[in-house]
Amino acid sequence: MKISCCWLFAISKFGYPPSLPNTYRALEEMAALGFKGVELEGVGEDNLRAVSGARQEIKARCDELGLTVVNFCPVLPDLVHPEKARRIHALDLFKLGVETASFFGSEMVQTISSTPPLTFVGDTPYKDALAFGQRYQVEVDPAFRWDALWGWLTDSMGACADEADRTGLKLCLEPRVGEIVSNTDALLRLMEAVDSDNFGAVLDTGHLHAQKEILPLSVEKLGSRILYVHASDNDGQTNQHLAPGKGNVDWDGVFLALKKHAFSGYVAVDVGNVPNLDAQYKKSKAFLESLAARLDV
């Protein structure tokens, strides 16, 4: 099992998104915890341009620390904006994200389906911070049309998959609570609509367990389309991202199913918004290493 460290580590420590100085600090701390593979993100236009602009320095620091960037995620909600000009601009930014991922030597570039363009009353998912266990209430505009939103999403994901393929990268997407694609079946429907062999899945155990999915069945549904795993635990009631073993995720079932489908990608520790973060990442890494040895995965 190849184990890496999610960018949620940096976000939990330094805010959303971390500044460039804190990006370097996060990488140093990831290396100190024993990780060799890491994620990076570019959140919105300003942060994406900042990370891309500093890519030579970031890559050099990763090399010094013995780190490999296994996944880069440009977070661009405007890929599904109702205004076409905003979607086109977001796609141009995604191209910058692909160039950045390629420069880092990543094999994957990740995207999100984003929150739907509804009016949230109170908390909005992933707006200013990555918070878990929230309750969402929305107002639906009478002019809202689901078919139009789905069309924007499929068109944008198709364009993103093509752009990634041109650079030799795989495109992956994770279903997340509160977003347009929030479960395995929605992702399968999106994959069918996009119809690209280059488009794969991030199996995020924390989000899917909170959606009451039977996780080994989720693995069976996605099969060889799983490119990457985000590993966190919870009690199935909320989408908390606790250390593996701290909730009731069926870890044996998940990894035996992954083994059946010959999964060989990275499993990333995706723990956040918990006390004693460093200790929880160490325990998570040890838990996954022990699981891998016991199940021979």
Task: Map each language-model feature to its residues.
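Active-site beta-loop-alpha junctions enriched in small/polar residues
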Residues: L8-S12, E41-V43, P74-P77, S114-P116, ...
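A short helix->loop->beta-strand "cap" motif at the edges of active sites that frequently abuts
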Residues: L67, S106, L169, H261-G265
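Aromatic- and acidic-residue-enriched segments that line the glycan-binding/catalytic groove
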Residues: P117-Y136
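Acidic/histidine-rich catalytic cores of soluble enzymes
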Residues: L20, G37-V38, E64, V69-F72, ...
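N-terminal pre-domain/capping segments
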Residues: M1-M108, L118-T119, W150, T154, ...
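A short, acidic, amphipathic alpha-helical segment used as a generic capping/interface helix at domain edges
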Residues: V249-K259
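Short, hinge-like loop/turn segments at secondary-structure boundaries
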Residues: Q56-I58, I88-A90, K127-D128, R189-M191, ...
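A structural motif
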Residues: F35, A101-S106, I226, A231, ...
